[in-house]
Curated annotation (Swiss-Prot):
Species lineage: Bacteria, Bacillati, Bacillota, Bacilli, Bacillales
InterPro entries (UniProt xref): DUF1450 (IPR009910), UPF0349 (IPR022916)
Source organism of the structure: Staphylococcus saprophyticus subsp. saprophyticus (strain ATCC 15305 / DSM 20229 / NCIMB 8711 / NCTC 7292 / S-41)
Family: Belongs to the UPF0349 family.
Pfam hit, one: DUF1450
Protein name: UPF0349 protein SSP1836
């Protein structure tokens, strides 16, 4: 079983699409896209994703990508 990273489609339009595509190419991560993840306050203020149910935020697409990988390293039991 792989870590799961979930994106809101509205957040993809703000630069999250770059992160989504990078993660989609990683065979060790399952990436999902939803119409809405019910985190509208966070979504409207910046980039974020749910990583195994935890909110991970970034100031830029590269920052979000690094924080997602860091969160997986810190919390995922391989």
């Amino acid at each position: 079983m792989n870590p799961i990273v979930e994106f809101c489609i509205s957040n993809l339009a703000k630069g999250g699409d770059y992160v989504y595509n990078q993660l989609e190419n990683d065979p060790g991560i399952d990436v999902l896209e939803y119409g809405c993840l019910q985190n509208c306050g966070i979504c409207s203020s910046g980039l974020y994703a749910l990583v195994n149910g935890d909110i991970v935020e970034g100031e830029s697409p590269d920052d979000l990508l690094q924080k997602i990988y860091a969160h997986i390293e810190e919390t995922w039991i391989f």
